[in-house]
Every structure is written in structure tokens, then in C-alpha cells.
């Protein structure tokens, strides 16, 4: 019996050390060496202060800023430790009610905007933490942001255009605008005036 237990325990200890220590440390070390920004969470630092991550959406409630997609991480919006979709099916009345409330809130924030509300401004992403919106969603909000900041709409739309990222490799995904990067650029342009 000892002939069976001893090799099993040695193999268990060896594989535990290999897969539980050596492999994670090697992968983490390689990631930090090859991709230092991404390995640290793609943090955005401004003036020595971390202001967010380019990978995690944030709650911008100020109407002078662009708003991202709704968060599905209730009851704490944009909580990265609670990432996950809302799990509401397309026929669920709760989803229809939530979308209706979000449309009403967008209309109340910009009563003069009669354009159709882009779907990504009223529905959460699969993770509930999407940092990006479509260019259509950004342009939908541009008039409100320009009016509240006293900026020409052309300047705000140009800022949106300059922050629009093409699909990955030209075909994977859709064009997108990172809300944090756009709002930081907007704040920087306002501070430069």
C-alpha cells in the first residue's frame, strides 16, 4: 500500500508546485515583461493619479460627459468584481421596462434630441462593464455635451471622430469609442480653452 500512496503524494506535490506556482509565476512574469500595461490592468494614469482602466466601463453621471453603456452589475453599478450580464431575455418584461426607463432618462437629459436612441445606450453588454460605445451612441450625445460645455458641436463631433477606433484587424468587431478616453480628451480640451 505504501508503494502506491508515496508515488501518488510525490506526484501530487510536484504537479501542485508546477501548476500552482511555477506556471502562474512564469506566465505573470512573461506578461509583465512583454505587455506591461495590459498585465497591470490597462490602467489610465493622468497627472500621477489612476483615473480608470481602458478595459472597464465607469459611471459618468455628469451630463457634461459622455455616458457609457448601462451597467448590469446591480446593485453596485460598474463593479468589476460582479461582472456579468443581466440575464434578462429579449421577451422579459423587466428588460423592456429597463430599456424604456433608460430611453426616458436620455430624452430628459437632452429634450431637443429627436434622433433614435442607439441600442447600446439602453442595453448592457454581456459583461456589464463595457468601456466602449458605438460612434452612433457618441454622436447621439455630442449635442448635449457641446451645449452644456459651451463648445461648438463640430468640435465635439471631431473629438468623437478622432477617438473612434476601427474594428480589430479591420474586420473583427465594430467601430467603437472608449468613453473614458473620450471624456479625458474632452476635459483636456476644455481645460486648454
UniProtKB/Swiss-Prot annotation:
Bilayer-spanning residue ranges: 7-27
Main location (coarse class): membrane
Membrane topology of this protein: Single-pass membrane protein
GO cellular component: plasma membrane
Keyword Nucleotide-binding: yes
Domain of life according to the entry: Bacteria
One GO MF term: ATP binding
Keywords, in A-Z order: ATP-binding, Cell inner membrane, Cell membrane, Ion transport, Membrane, Nucleotide-binding, Potassium, Potassium transport, Transmembrane, Transmembrane helix, Transport
InterPro entries for the chain: KdpC
Keyword Amino-acid biosynthesis (UniProt): no
Subcellular location: Cell inner membrane
Pfam families the UniProt entry points to: KdpC
Known function: Part of the high-affinity ATP-driven potassium transport (or Kdp) system, which catalyzes the hydrolysis of ATP coupled with the electrogenic transport of potassium into the cytoplasm. This subunit acts as a catalytic chaperone that increases the ATP-binding affinity of the ATP-hydrolyzing subunit KdpB by the formation of a transient KdpB/KdpC/ATP ternary complex.
Family, similarity comment: Belongs to the KdpC family.
Entry-linked PANTHER family: POTASSIUM-TRANSPORTING ATPASE C CHAIN (PTHR30042), POTASSIUM-TRANSPORTING ATPASE KDPC SUBUNIT (PTHR30042:SF2)
Subunit structure of this chain's protein: The system is composed of three essential subunits: KdpA, KdpB and KdpC.
UniProt-recorded name of the protein: Potassium-transporting ATPase KdpC subunit
